[in-house]
């Protein structure tokens, strides 16, 4: 199977700024993480659903000839782990590891602790929230995309 390319946050922003509408952004994190912070316009299909089968059909139904962009909290091998299962033909993957490297300023609007997350995961989510705040143009661009109903 061919190597699945990764996409940086800057490349995603450029894609969104271009007005392209030929892709579906799938978030494979768990529902609690998705509830806390998400890229507007992304569709939640947890990795557990993909690995157990029903998520595969959900993603296939969303594609309709569009490119599939996948992001998760861990980045690197995680999106590739299920992509290489050969149940889906993926063309692109977003490295969540890269997207968590946003500006690390404090975020007063986001609580510094969350009982649902461990200490290390809280830090990652705070970095993710900082990234979303700093890249508000990215959020506006995603919000302008047509909504996908499931």
Curated annotation (Swiss-Prot):
Transmembrane segments: none annotated. It comes from the Bacteria. Residues 19-93 form the Rhodanese domain. SMART domains: RHOD. Pfam families: Rhodanese. InterPro entries: Rhodanese-like_dom (IPR001763), Rhodanese-like_dom_sf (IPR036873). This is Uncharacterized 16.5 kDa protein in psaL 5'region. It comes from Synechococcus elongatus.
């Amino acid at each position: 199977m061919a190597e699945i390319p990764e996409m940086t946050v800057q490349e995603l922003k450029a894609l969104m700024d271009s007005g392209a509408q030929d892709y579906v952004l799938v978030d494979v994190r768990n529902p609690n993480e998705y509830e806390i912070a998400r890229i507007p316009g992304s569709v939640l299909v947890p990795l557990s659903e993909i690995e157990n089968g029903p998520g595969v059909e959900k993603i296939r139904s969303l594609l309709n000839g569009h490119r599939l962009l996948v992001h998760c909290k861990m980045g690197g091998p995680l999106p590739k782990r299920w992509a290489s299962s050969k149940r889906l033909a993926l063309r692109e993957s977003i490295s969540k590891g890269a997207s968590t490297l946003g500006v690390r300023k404090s975020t007063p609007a986001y609580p510094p602790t969350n009982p649902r997350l461990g200490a290390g995961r809280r830090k990652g989510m705070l970095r993710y929230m900082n990234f979303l705040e700093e890249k508000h143009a990215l959020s506006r661009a995603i919000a302008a995309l047509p909504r996908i109903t499931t």
